Amino acid sequence: DKLIGSCVWGATNYTSDCNAECKRRGYKGGHCGSFWNVNCWCEE
């Protein structure tokens, strides 16, 4: 998966809707994952 930003408000590269942002970039979709779900990952 491709890390594009953060799911935490106020954080660097904050993404309000991870799934929608990933789709906009041409990925299948996305989800918030990693430690405490802080990162937005796009599915290749």
Swiss-Prot record:
One of the GO biological process terms: killing of cells of another organism
Disulfide pairings: 7-32, 18-40, 22-42
Localization: Secreted
Pfam families for this protein: Defensin_2
Tissues expressing the protein: Hemolymph.
Keywords of the record: Antimicrobial, Defensin, Disulfide bond, Fungicide, Immunity, Innate immunity, Secreted
InterPro entries: Defensin_invertebrate/fungal, Scorpion_toxin-like_sf
A GO cellular-component term linked to this record: extracellular space
Top-level taxon of origin: Eukaryota
Reported induction: By bacterial infection.
Assigned protein family: Belongs to the invertebrate defensin family. Type 2 subfamily.
Function, in words: Has antibacterial activity against the Gram-positive bacterium S.lutea (MIC=1.9 uM). Lacks antibacterial activity against the Gram-positive bacteria L.monocytogenes and M.luteus, and the Gram-negative bacteria E.coli D31, E.coli ATCC 25922, and S.typhimurium.
Protein name: Defensin-like peptide
